[in-house]
Amino acid sequence: MLTNMKKFFIFVLTLFFLNIVNAESYYIKDVNYKITGITRQYALETKVKIDKKKIFESEDELRKYLDDIVIQMLNTRTFDTVTYTCVIDDLQSTEDSISEKSNTENNDNTEESVLPQNTSNNTQTKNVTVTFFTNDTKHLIATPYPKYKSGDCLTAMIKVKDTNFAGSMENFTANVDFAVELNKDDEPESFKTGFSTDFGIPFKMGKLDTVWDNSIDFSYTFGDSSPEWNFGTGLKMALPFDKYSLIFNIKQSFIKNFDYDGEWKGTGEYRTYYKYNDSLYFVENVGFSIPIVIQEVNNWGRIYYTPFVNATYNWDFDGIHNDDTYLLGPGMTFGQTISTGRVNWIENFRNGINVSLTQIFGYNFNSYAFNPGITAELKLYKAFKNLGLSADLYAYAYMNGTDNFGSRLRGIRKDQYYDSDDPNIAILKSTDAQAAFVFNFDMPIKLFRIYWEKVPVINKIKASSKFNLEAQISPFLDIALFKNEETGTSFNIKDSFISGGIEGIVYPLRWKGIQVRGSLGIDLTRKMPVLKGKVNQDWRESCKSYEISIGIGLHY
C-alpha cells in the first residue's frame, strides 16, 4: 500500500516539474488591421488600446483577452462586424523574446518601449501576431430633421451627422436650421435662422496623441441688430505612458451672445432687468490632467484616478461687468476624479456600469469666491432578450455655488422660478440648487424590428433595405431631491420634482451610432392624482405641466 502511494506521489511530482520545465506563455508581438471602410488605423488604435506588454500564461487566457478586444471594438458602434486571427510563432525563451524586441524598439519611457516581463526563467514564450478584420457600419446621415423642446424651441433643420468623420471615429455634426423660440408657456417668442458645426480631428504629433477640436455656431434672430456666434478651436494633446497619461488642453472662443448684454431675473413685481453690455467677448481656457491607472480588471477595463486643473478667463475690450456673475473671472478649478466603467451593447440594449466620483475646488480671482464641491454619478444598464433596464443616479453639492439639474428631468420646465415673497429668492430658478440628488429610471422595450426588403410592395424599392430599423418604447421616471431655497428643506420628497412619461426610440440598423428619440414627460407632482396635493408645490411658479422633446441621441 505504501509502495503504491509513493509511486503515485512521485508520478504527480514528475508531472508538476515537467509542467514547469515545459511551461508556455504568450505575448502579442504584432497587431495588424484589415479595415473595410474609411476608419483609420490610428483612430482605432487610440480608441481601443491593445496591451503588447502583458504575458499570457495560457492560450486560453490569450483568446479570452482577444475576444474582449473584439467586444470593445463593437462597443464603439463604428463597426458592423469584427473578427480576428492570430499566428503563434515557434517557441523561444522569454529572455530571447525580450532581447529581440528590445533590439527593434527605441529605448525610451513611452508606452511602446515597455517590454513584457516574465519572472520564470524556465518559461517558454510564444510570439503572437494578431490581425483584426473590421467592417464599418454606415456612419453618415443627412436628412430634414424636426426638433422640438417644450419651453425652448421648435426647429426645422437639415441635419448632417457623421459618427466616424473622415475615419477618425469622432463625431461631426452640421445643421442648417430655422427655429421658433418658445417661452415657458410654449408661445412663440422669436424667430431665428443659422447654421452650426462641431467636429474633432485626431492625429499624431510626434509622440503626442492629439485632437484638433472645432466648433462653429452662427445664428440670426429676426429683429436683432446683428447675428450671434460662437467660434471655438483648440487642441487636446496626450502623452501616453504605461500606467498614466499627461493631457494638456487649450481652447479659445470668440462669442457674440445677446444673453450677456443683460438679463431679466425674477417673476411678477420682482422681475428686474440687469444691464451688462458683455455680449461680445472672448474665452481662453487651458487645462491639465493626469489619468492614472490604479487597477486593471480583466474583461472590464481600467480604474482611473485623475487629478486635474483647469483655468478659464473671459474678457472683452471694455471689461466684464461686475454684476455679470456668469462671465466674471478669471477662475480656476482644481480637482480629482476616480472613475471606471464598462458598457457592452447587446444588439440595441446596454449591459454594464459607469461610475465616477469627483471632488472640485473652484476659485474666482475677481470675486474671491471659493467654491469646493463634489459630484458623483452611477449609471447602470441591464440587458434582457426584449427589454432593458437603465438607471442614472447623479448627486452634487457645492459650498458657495449652484448647478442646474433641469435638463436631467423630462417633464419639468428648467426655466421656472421660485414663487417667493423674498426678492433674493424670487430671482432664482427652482432647478438651480446648491445640492441635489437626481434619479432617472428607464425600461426600454423592443416593439419590433422591420426589414423593408421583406415587406411586399416596399421590397420593390431598391434602397428600402437602407431604412431597416428597430423600434423601442421606454416608460421612464425622473426624481430630483434638492436643497430648496424657498422652503428651507433639503432632500425632502415633499418639496421635490417628480416626473414620468414615455419615450419612443428608433435604431436605424445600418447606422449603429445613431438613435432617434421622442419623449413625452409629465410633471407628476402636479398631475398625478396619487401625488397631487400631497407634494408641496407652493414654492414654485405655475407653468406647463408637460414637456415634449424630439431629437437624436439617448437621454443618458
Predicted regions and their residues:
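Outer-envelope beta-barrel architecture signal
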Residues: 126-128, 138-142, 154, 168-172, ...
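Outer-membrane beta-barrel translocator/channel fold
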Residues: 182-190, 215-229, 250-280, 393-432, ...
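Transmembrane beta-barrel wall of Gram-negative outer-membrane proteins
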Residues: 189-321
